[in-house]
Amino acid sequence: MLVIFEGLDNCGKTTLVQMIKDYYLKLGIDAEISKEFETNIGKELKKMAKEGTLDPILKAYLFATDRYIRMKNIRQEDLKNKIMLFDRYVPSALAYRMAEGVDKNWVTNINSVFPKADIGFFIDIREHSKINVNIF
């Protein structure tokens, strides 16, 4: 089962996804987390994104490449036999790239190779309630 979690940066998605995984594991249900920036391309993408030097079109391709590599590492039987929890997925690609002025249909097209989520959750939190993870 493919379950996705979306929401603003620092809204608690990663913490929530980890808690859900732990809960499933306690119940004896196999669960795994996948999130952006875990592949080699993803790690480089994170560095470049922090520098702010990436063109929005290139970002769309690189995020899709990172997602593609992560999906290639997931066997089809895993999608049937375990809970796959994604901390960000295609909706984030659409939201971020459209906010940068990239055409919705174009972004949708390059992400059309990815399976549709079985269920998705959007963590809706007020801006002032976001978790401050940059304390130090």
Predicted regions and their residues:
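Short coil/turn segments at secondary-structure junctions
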Residues: 58, 135-136
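Walker A (P-loop) phosphate-binding loop of P-loop NTPases
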Residues: 10
